[in-house]
Amino acid sequence: SWIGVLSMGTLTLSAQQQAIENPPDWAAEVVWYQIFVERFYNGDPSNDPRPQDLTGAYPGFVPENWRVTPWTHDWYAPDPWFEGLEQQRDLSGNPMEHFNQKVQLRRYGGDLQGVLEKISYLDSLGITAVFFNPLNDAPSLHKYDARNWRHIDRNFGPDPDGDIAIMAMEDPTDPATWRMTSADLLFVEVIRALHARDIRVILDYSWNHTGVDCWAWQDVLKNQQASPYSDWYWVQEWDDPATDSSEFRYRGWAGVPSLPEIRETVHMEHIEKVEPFEGDIYAAAAKQHIFHITQRWLDPNGDGNPDDGVDGFRLDVAAEMPLGFWRDYRRHVRNINPNAYLIGEIWWEQYPDKLLDPLPYLEGDVFDAVMNYRWYRAARHFFNASPDTISVTDLVDSLQNFTGNLPTANNYAMMNLVSSHDVPRVA
């Protein structure tokens, strides 16, 4: 009967919708391990970063006698090339007087070969998922300043110069021209090796900004309003060629000039307070480009079977991008891999006193989980021997308070962490 057909159709639609809304079943039992590749293990010294590979990264220059830092170097001991840095200024015009400025020039040469060689060790720990900090090609140690999103970093693979040549032959806007670099292929091998041990792979991306060495940003700098990517970024004022000085101004993430922000349909100021907001990415081409990159790593060989790809994404500064974009992003990801996992970096509402309520991001249409910094904060205060240690009662109250308003499935899918690349380690 028509009623029966209608009922079956409704049930099918409901099941599909539920599959999109719910976290994947595997996310409830994850034991996480985070890998910051540049600092993990140097398995191939032949691909170590060179001075030219740092172009575009903070502080905006490379000392003449710069070299890779030995793996066992005392962290607080100056490198030989520290000498004279006080006479230089960083991208913001600040003198290079402090250790924390100088140390950002350090590179240790960690790479994907190093990860591959340590997979048996990782498996022996009992982990079930690896969260990789960004692997995209970028000049910094952290890779949140992408030169491009589509390829793995040149210094993480076996042939940096060959990979640079491949990238140069491609049209960044046309996925049909994209090839697999040696670093890309090695990452696919790392995924395969981890999957063989039943270890899931989550890849970190920041769609909120690029680096200043990004191909699209470089075109904007060169061609200004005439650039086909002029609407990709938050440009506040264009340069007037009739004057001797540059009037060009733009928004960088958190005011950092080396991280130009992708433009959204709504501007929200996040310096004083972060809160959820509606909207989308302004340029349809920029959004489509992000979707192409996402598909590339969910299904690297493009055969429709996502088994060879990553199992999801960790999304950087996720609260600083609009909810409308994230809803579309979730649908795109789940259409490629129905079991993919999306985790947002939802952290401060007002630093350093108030953490952001993640509920608006955990209602089935955005993320499966967030990096659980509320759990982190309570756990650190309880387990650390610090002046602000809390009691068992306070710990339990804190945990119950912030889990009580969240869906059960999302609570189980959370990434409960005791440290990350953004906070001190527990020791």
Task: Kindly give the residue locations of the regions a language model identified.
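Active-site-proximal helices and loops of the catalytic beta/alpha 8
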Residues: 190-199, 208-209, 217-225, 292-295, ...
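Polysaccharide-binding and catalytic clefts of secreted carbohydrate-active enzymes
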Residues: 78, 135, 220-336, 343, ...
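Aromatic- and acidic-residue-enriched segments that line the glycan-binding/catalytic groove
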Residues: 24, 28, 44-68, 138-158, ...
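Bacterial N-terminal signal peptides
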Residues: 1-10
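Short, solvent-exposed turn/loop segments enriched in Gly/Ser/Thr/Pro and often Arg
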Residues: 37-39, 130-142, 204-214, 316-321, ...
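Active-site clefts of carbohydrate-active enzymes
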Residues: 409-427
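N-terminal structural segment of carbohydrate-active enzymes
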Residues: 16-200
